[in-house]
Every structure is written in C-alpha cells, then in structure tokens.
Amino acid sequence: MSTTIVGFPRLGEFRELKFTTEKYFRKEISEEELLAAAKDLRAKHWNIVKEKGITEIPSNDFSHYDNFLDAAFLFNVVPASVQNLDLSDLERYFALGRGYQGEKGDVRALPMKKWFNTNYHYIVPKFEKDTQVKLAGHKIFDEFQEAKELGLNTRPVLVGPFTFLQLSDFEEGVKADDFVDSLVAAYQEVFAKLAELGATCIQLDEAALVKDLTAEEKALFLNLYNKLLADKKGLEVLLQTYFGDVRDVYADLVNLPVDAIGFDFVEGKKTLELVKGGFPADKTLYAGIVNGKNIWRNNYEKSLAVLEQIPAENIVLTSSCSLLHVPFTTANEEFEPALLNHFAFAVEKLDEIRDLDAIRNGQGSEALAANKELFATERVGENAELRARIAGLTDTDYTRLPAFAEREAIQEEAFKLPALPTTTIGSFPQTKEVRAKRLAYRKGELSQKEYDAFLAETIDEWIKWQEDIDFDVLVHGEFERNDMVEYFGQNLSGYLFSKNGWVQSYGMRGVKPPIIWGDVTRLNPITVKWSSYAQSRTNKPVKGMLTGPVTILNWSFPREDISIKDSTLQIALAIKDEVLDLEAAGVKIIQIDEAALREKLPLRRSDWYEDYLDWAIPAFRLVHSTVAPDTQIHTHMCYSEFTDIIPAIDNMDADVISFEASRSNLEILDELKAKNFQTEVGPGVYDIHSPRVPNEGEIDNTIEAILAKVPSKKVWINPDCGLKTRGIPETKESLIRLVEAAKAAREKL
C-alpha cells in the first residue's frame, strides 16, 4: 500500500515564509532573495515528508500567497488593470492579492472569500469578456523540477478546472461555459509540459464536487472532464475531493477515465456508503482517513474499521484534506506529555498515515497498542454545574424583548446619533511598540502597573484622536489583545494554547487557534476593565468589544468527544456573563463579533439548519437576550457568502450588523433589500486587507451605492474590518476620508 497527503503547510515551522515575504513587502530584501528563501523552504518540507516514509510526495501545494491565485496567474485570468502594470511577474501576482498603489499605478485587490468551511481565504479571480485563457505561468513546472533535482519525483497539485470555474467570478455577459475549451486546452498544455519533465501523475483538486450540484453544474463538470481526459498526455490523473462526499456525481465520477480518485472519509457523511456500493477495479482509491482539519490524535481502531470496509483493490492512505489547515508540528510545544500525546499536527499526521499503512500490512503492532492505550480512558471530566445550567435553558433564554422595532426607537432616543453614524470595527494598528510592551509584560520584564499605564496612555491617545476627527461611536482599540479568540480563551476554563500552533488564514497572515480541551466557563471578567476605562474618557459612546460564541468555537480546534453544539452553548454562557458585566459597568453599545458564523455552515443546503443554524443562531441570541432595550448590540461578520443565509442573520436579533462587503463590490446589498432585512447595517466602505488608501471620492461612491439599496436610517459607515494589521498613517488617512465622506453624504439626505 502507498501513502501520501493532499498537501502540506506552506508558512514553515516558524512562519519563515511570512517573515521573509513581509521583508520583501517592506523592500528590505530583493525579489531574488525572497524566491531563494521560498525554494529552501520547499526543499525542507519535501525532505520532512520523505523522511516520514510518505511514498507519494505532492508538489505545487506551496504558494507565495494563495493556491487559487496561483491557478489564476498560471492560466492568465488576470484583469487588464493588473496586466498593464509595468511590474515584474511577482509584483503583479502580489498586486492581485494585496492591491497596488505606487508610481506605476493604483489597482484594488481581487475579492477574497472563505475556502469552503475553513478559516482559510482564497483570492477570487474574475473572468472578463476579454480574458484570454492560456498557459502563462511556470511555477508548477519550476517546483516539479526543483524536487526532481533533489531526487524526488513528485505529484504536482493543481486546482481542478471545475472548482476553478465554480469559485471564480464572471463579468456580466460571460459565463463558465464560454471558457471550457480554452481552459481545457491550457490544462492539457500543463499535462504535456509536466510529462516532458518526467512527471507521471497530476493531482486535480475538485473540492467543489462535495457541494450540492445542479444539473447544469454536473453538465459543466462532465463536459470539462470528458474533453480534458480525452488526451491526458501520458499522465495519470488523480481527481482529489475533500471537505465532504460526492453523492451528486459519484456514479459519473467513477466512470470517468481518471486513474485515481481521492475521497474524504472524515467529513464525507456518505463516502463509505458510496464506495461500498462499488468502486472500479481499474482505479486507485485515495482514502482520506486522517483528519486534515483538527489536531486530535487519530483513533487507529476506528480508522482501521473504516478501511476494512472499503472494497477497492488499490488503496492509498492520505489525509482528508490538505494539512495547511493544522499547525506544523507539536515538537515545539511545551504541554505536559499527558496533554501532548493527544495532539497531532501536520508532521505528526504523517506518522499516523504511515502507522496505519504499516498496521494494515501486518506491521506496526507497537503503534497500534500505544494508540489503543491512549483512547482507553476518558480524557477529561465534566463540569456538573455547567451541564446543569445548559440543561435548564428554555425558549425564553434565547428571546430578547422588546422586539427589534421597539428597541430601535428606544435606542434612537437614547443615543441621539446623527444619520449615517460613523464607527470602526474595533481594533486599531498594533505597532511594534504595542507588541513589544505585551511581550515584555508576558516575560515579566514589565510590571502590571507599568503595562497598565502604557495601555491607558495608548487608549487615551486614540480616544482623543477619534473625538478630534468627529467619530460618532468610538472604540478603545483592543491594544491589550493578541488575538480575538485567544484573548478570550485565556480567560476561560477548558482552553489550551499552543506556543507555535500557527495556521495560514489569508496571504501571509497566520492565526493560532486555541484548543478546546474540556468544559468551558468564564474564570473572571475579561474586557470590562479596559472598556469601562475607555468609556470614562469620553462623553461619546464607546463600544464594548467581544468575540461571539460561534466564532470562538469555529476559530478554535474543537473537541471531538462532545458535539460542537454543546461546546458552543458552553461558550455562549461564558460570553453572556461578560455582556451583562459590561452593561452593568456602563457600556451601552456592545459588539459581539461573529466573524466566522458562515465558516462551519455545512456545504450542503439540506444540512444547514438541522446541523448548524438551528443551534448557532440561538447560541448568539442566548448571549444578549437579557440586556436592557437601550443597550445596543452590534455584530460583525467576515468575508463569506452571506446572501443565502440573510434571514438567519436577521434572526440573530442584533441591533446593528457590519459586513466585510467592500471587497466584493457590496454584492450583499441586493439580497438585503430583497429579503427586507431589518437589522441596521454597516456594509464596510473600504477594504482594510489591502494597504492602499481609498482615493478621493472612492468612499463617497461606495456610500452612494449603499444608500441606493438600503434606507439611510438603517446605514452605518465603517471600514470593512478591524485595523489591527494596518499601519498608523494609512489608517488615519483612510478614517479621516471616511468621516468626511459620511458628513458629505448626510448633507445630501
């Protein structure tokens, strides 16, 4: 039996790629130095996979920014505005992901969306009327050659043509079918070039096949692959799926002339049932049996029981998806062995795949025995008081009174805000000084008194600055917080925190998800100190800033021994206690961020409510259901597809919601109007994920577009996300323009 993985993390064991790339962005190193460092990192990663005994090693799973963007660049799906920039290929590539503002021009970044139900974000290409799809890049060939020079005949990985078309945007007047022939020709050119270089197999990632597919989408898939596979140029083709099962196309899929198919046996509800119904003897089945999205040890007995039921003659063991969704290795962690033994990060998952292969081949008895022992006893006990509190919840605990319309009138009278009130999402830039002071405090080099004095001074500066430019609702800036989930988790029982458990989120940005180890309760007030301090420094309202229970759950590595619903309700009660303490301390506007609400929405619509929304939305309502009617509840949501769950979002019963919608051209506005959305809304008037400052008139035009779709009394003016990662000069310049644009728009009402 052979072993492989779908893909490997890119940032490096210690986020080397992130830090090197950021040096390049700051012009501290050259393009050549960046490319050389990336080449060294790839070699290191391939060597790790090889030394762990994995027999089939992927290549081109590495990316300087995003693998979907890589595919767009490879196939020339690049807007003319970027094509025409007098920049190097690498500079144009980064301009697509980050935007560009300089002497050569000014272009906005492409939109960014969540990658299925993960916290990874992909860059969304756009097919335009004049898009000429052709083979234009060489990264996939360069990296195959690099590996070959190291003595490795790798399996290049590429986004499949169906998923590429399904997840891209299209200019009005063009559609996916228009590009089938040119895209197939470009893929076949890739096949031919790889075959020339000595490749024997290519992996085409078709995650879009695990979603609900219409008849038209199935027809598109079959049209693409019937044409593509008519001439494979001598390559074997592995069609790889993940994040679910392929029930809609299984019968068609197994009859295609592909050589191998990869299935997800972790998240694929019906995968085992499908393959037990029959799998062709002339194809190889890649069994994704080791979870690529969570960090818990694999239960070998359970995995072996699944594998024994697979009727395929030729099986390759693999991960359920790319390992980029988990941290690099547990080797650098400082947990006690009794805790650490329960975790497997990317490198350790290589061991698990190898172990399972060995056990199936009659070896690995010691590994199996050790694994059995690990799962023989309960890992953690229960909090009986918490379980009783949850059991005692009734419908009234999830209902806020009075109803929204009455609260809206009460709050209008209480706050007396102008039309189109201005605010920010919460965080301000975390400078080197802010991070250095936090680190010094954590190391004991700065006393509590000294650290508090620094935070108070920083908050004072930003409160005064917000007053000076005439913001309406202020924020304290979150300078005391390292991360919007970790900061809360550190004040909750049941949480563990890795030292180096970084996972790529978008571009070079990493997040360090905490681990939910046991039952979750609040240990002490978390945000009251600094929120109430900030409110004491101004007569204007200052928002209290909390992370919501669904987002805390979704941006953590969840337990597998209880349901995510039960874990979320535990977190909801902890955050509810914090909301009530903030209210009692005089904080009358409280933002409960649900940035990741959409993230764990099942990929199939039939599962949306029963498996997720029926408990996720009530969990949010539980948090704020008992606040007074004159306390205003805000929430915020990050890049995602929201249009299909607008009624559920309205049902959260917040008073104000802000979306990250500016980068996607405010597409959500039409749906808000169509669904008669009642909650007040701040769609975001500029994109903070790009370092560019919005041009004169740009924010004015965005506000005008918003007001064309949403009644002015319902509209808030804000950036599309927090400003933690931005620089101070660009932040201040952008926010001054925002306030000026809001005032100008008020005069036109």
UniProtKB/Swiss-Prot annotation:
Similarity comment: Belongs to the vitamin-B12 independent methionine synthase family.
List of residues binding 5-methyltetrahydropteroyltri-L-glutamate: 15-18, 114, 555, 599
Pathway assigned in UniProt: Amino-acid biosynthesis; L-methionine biosynthesis via de novo pathway; L-methionine from L-homocysteine (MetE route): step 1/1
EC number(s) reported in the record: 2.1.1.14
Cofactor (UniProt): Zn(2+)
GO molecular function, one term: zinc ion binding
Binding residue positions for Zn(2+): 636, 638, 660, 721
Residues in the signal sequence: none
Key word Transcription regulation present: no
Residues given in the record as L-homocysteine binding sites: 425-427, 478, 593
Catalyzed reaction equations: 5-methyltetrahydropteroyltri-L-glutamate + L-homocysteine = tetrahydropteroyltri-L-glutamate + L-methionine
CDD domains xrefs: CIMS_C_terminal_like (cd03311), CIMS_N_terminal_like (cd03312)
Organism lineage: Bacteria, Bacillati, Bacillota, Bacilli, Lactobacillales
Residues holding L-methionine: 425-427, 478, 593
Cofactor notes: Binds 1 zinc ion per subunit.
One record GO biological process: methylation
One Pfam family matching this protein: Meth_synt_1
SUPFAM superfamilies found in the cross-reference section: UROD/MetE-like
Active site: 689 (proton donor)
Protein name per its UniProtKB record: 5-methyltetrahydropteroyltriglutamate--homocysteine methyltransferase
Function: Catalyzes the transfer of a methyl group from 5-methyltetrahydrofolate to homocysteine resulting in methionine formation.
Alphabetical keyword list: Amino-acid biosynthesis, Metal-binding, Methionine biosynthesis, Methyltransferase, Repeat, Transferase, Zinc
InterPro entries xrefs: Cbl-indep_Met_Synth_N, Cobalamin-indep_Met_synthase, Met_Synth_C/arc, UROD/MetE-like_sf
